[in-house]
Curated annotation (Swiss-Prot):
Binds directly to 23S ribosomal RNA and is necessary for the in vitro assembly process of the 50S ribosomal subunit. It is not involved in the protein synthesizing functions of that subunit. The keyword Membrane does not apply. It comes from Nocardioides sp. (strain ATCC BAA-499 / JS614). This is Large ribosomal subunit protein bL20. GO terms for molecular function: rRNA binding; structural constituent of ribosome.
Amino acid sequence: MARVKRAVNAQKKRRVVLERASGYRGQRSRLYRKAKEQVTHSLVYSYNDRRKNKGNFRKLWIQRINAAARAQGMTYNRFIQGLNLAGVEVDRKILADLAVNDVTAFNALVETAKAALPADVNAPKAEASA
């Protein structure tokens, strides 16, 4: 059986890892074993953070919608409830964009949501005169 010499493949593998680790501090950019460990962790972090990013954007959209809805005298919760009752199917990304860039369209949606909501059940009731 022929002898296998790994010099070329091993050097290429190490070079790729060290190139990915360029820019890291200290030994993590110069020593193969440290660099390999850090590159592996970095790939895991980037994978996880790509998923976290979606939740972060949703939080941002909700904050923007809430601020714009409160400016119109309505909370985020009641606004979304009113839109659902009115049958308006606009996602939070578009609502946040409207709140920032097209205030008149957003205000029209607020009025639609207000009209669709039932009377406030927690409001004090008028006393019936007996």
